[in-house]
């Protein structure tokens, strides 16, 4: 850069993907007082990201760094739970989601374009990188209670704990030795996440009901995460986000018949994230790119049809 030359940075990001779950479930009723259930769940996930970080120089030229990442994973999980009815108007429940081991494959590549005058410009391409590994998700458990108000409605509360700080990376042989740095970092910067849900249902008729609820999840990472962020990777996508707490507002309807049932729900998920284009810990004051707060609202529609045999 020339003396007194300024830099104008900008950033572009596009994400896409899906997360599918397929379940095989069993449930049992014991004297109308104890209800038990279990399910085997198959997960299929894909995530893609295209990003570009650009710097335009005030005197001449500029540079850009483009990145592509595709991550795919499959896993099998197990969930078990139960409901106990100590009195006709009280329900107490608990469930456990065992850690899921995902078999994961990452593919990434990048290119850097530079322009510093008529005779000094070009593009440099990285070789395509791929990485195969396994990721073990945390243990998740739920506790719940519900109070039934006659034949017209109920109020329920639920607590969920996800021990995010116990997740870990492993190689294809389920050995985590080569990922000691990454796994130690997970334990240092991730929190055990707590979620509280409160909801209610009112029966308009014997078959039709309306529902509403609210949920709150604490921050999944510690506040000092940004200061301790030191990625150990040969990838060149340097951006990352530090998430805050999450709120959910829900509403829905349900219809119950003798042989079938239909449920429809709307979930509005809201959270903020602090965006960093790169790790600014070692950048001198006055040269750091400003952070940005990204506010996300995710509206989901869920429909379920159940058949009784």
Describe the role of every protein-language-model region.
Residues 1-309:
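Outer-membrane beta-barrel porins/channels
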